[in-house]
Amino acid sequence: MQNIPKNMFEPAAANAGDAEKISKKSLSLWKDAMLRFRSNKLAMVGLIIIVLIILMAIFAPMFSRYDYSTTNLLNADKPPSKDHWFGTDDLGRDIFVRTWVGARISIFIGVAAAVLDLLIGVIWGSISGFRGGRTDEIMMRIADILWAVPSLLMVILLMVVLPKGLFTIIIAMTITGWINMARIVRGQVLQLKNQEYVLASQTLGAKTSRLLFKHIVPNAMGSILVTMTLTVPTAIFTEAFLSYLGLGVPAPLASWGTMASDGLPALTYYPWRLFFPAGFICITMFGFNVVGDGLRDALDPKLRK
């Protein structure tokens, strides 16, 4: 082995400024959250599932020669085949087309209910948390009273009183659905309203609306987004349960809930009538739940590196 003389080496001079240098480029909260979300394989699987279901709901009925409401008693209760991929129901309607038309309605109900919960909950929770004092007490006691009533019971009562329809279901779900969002937003506002940048803006004369929707709510958007994502599968499941009770969307409209309700009595002899709508309810709920969990982990400041 060849010996290398020591005089060929020169010790590296320590630079005091090197300790102050940032070795890694700093990332914003959202960029860092996006990177960690993309590294979460289960969350990405859930996102792909949701995107595929939405695309199929939009385009699949367009390329089928069957209509979701056309009946043909000669083809009633046919098993899955090359002509009817998911089989037919008791009226001879193609279950494949009805499944994807039902996906439009079920997902629309879930997203619409989540958006209304977001709007009402953010406004209610923001005002309650920011005002504090007697205003906070009154607003949260009202929310507690509504929360004390079983939400499903209130939804069923409203569905009985109001005329059956798509928007009636959404309104009934929103009556108590916003309370959880309001509580979360209120907690975030109570933490953020005493931060230095909020106090500085308040000192400079910023209005309450600007303080809330310019400084406070955007910084609470992580928790809001996660809660909204987890609200969608709950609304889809609630619609399915209401359909089982006969309070779903009226015929000839199809949702996963109404299809599952119609297919349940025929489970023994025609299982495909229940299997496909119930299966997609489970898959969609799984997708939204794992995406919500992934967002929660990605936006958790304790996990930031």
Swiss-Prot record:
The chain crosses the membrane at residues 43-63, 105-125, 166-185, 212-232, 236-256, 274-294. Induction: Positively regulated by TnrA under nitrogen-limited conditions. The lineage of its organism: Bacteria, Bacillati, Bacillota, Bacilli, Bacillales. It comes from Bacillus subtilis (strain 168). Belongs to the binding-protein-dependent transport system permease family. OppBC subfamily. GO terms for molecular function: transmembrane transporter activity. This is Oligopeptide transport system permease protein OppC. It holds the Pfam family BPD_transp_1. The complex is composed of two ATP-binding proteins (OppD and OppF), two transmembrane proteins (OppB and OppC) and a solute-binding protein (OppA).
